[in-house]
Amino acid sequence: MKAAQNEAWQARFVAVISNQPDAKGLDFARQNGIPAVVVNHRDFASRDAFDEALAKTIDSFSPDLIALAGFMRVLTDPFIDRYQGRMINIHPSLLPDFPGLHTHERALEAGVKKHGASVHFVTRVVDEGPIICQGEVPVLPGDDVDTLAARVLKMEHRIYPLAVKWFINGRLHLEGSQVQISPPESQYIVQA
């Protein structure tokens, strides 16, 4: 959201919706006149009921794109199908390496020399959607989970706005399971 403000994008954020009442993004939205809505998953008896309420809330704002950030719940297949090709996520690893949780810890344990973040379309399989772009950071001697996570987060803040901007400018599309960016980019991996 900050990148959109700083660069004066030809788009607007129609809402920030979170399942966590204390999410920082909600405060940022409120401070900037963007509707901020909580759909707390704990208020629902089933996952299907939560997903239906979440979808109803999202649909009330008619977004062209849904950009997940810090959303740590697995969505149901019907929910994902509803927004196919219009929902993206950022994941703190160079997918397909280290899907799921604890990515930085796992990268350090594996002894990799580079780590990073991936922006991908959301599909039914967690963290396996078509990759839009990635950002690499080096794993430095002496890194711990916190130092590596901080470096990856900075990269996330570079590549997520890039992918969103491609979408809002009509350059990014999902055709079947293939990411199409037109005109093509010279690079899809951003390096620190």
Label every PLM stretch briefly.
Residues V37-R42, I90:
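Short beta->alpha connector loops at strand-helix junctions that form conserved
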Residues N32-G33, Y83:
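Short, structured coil segments at secondary-structure junctions
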Residues P35, D64, K113:
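Residue-level detector of anion-binding/catalytic polar loops
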Residues V14, D64, G85:
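Conserved acidic residues
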Residues A3, N19, A69-S182:
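Donor/substrate-binding cores of folate-linked one-carbon enzymes
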Residues M1-K24, F28:
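N-terminal Rossmann-like dinucleotide-binding module
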Residues S18-N19, R42-D43, R47-D51, F61-D77:
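N-terminal glycine-rich "phosphate-gripper" loop used for MgATP/nucleotide binding
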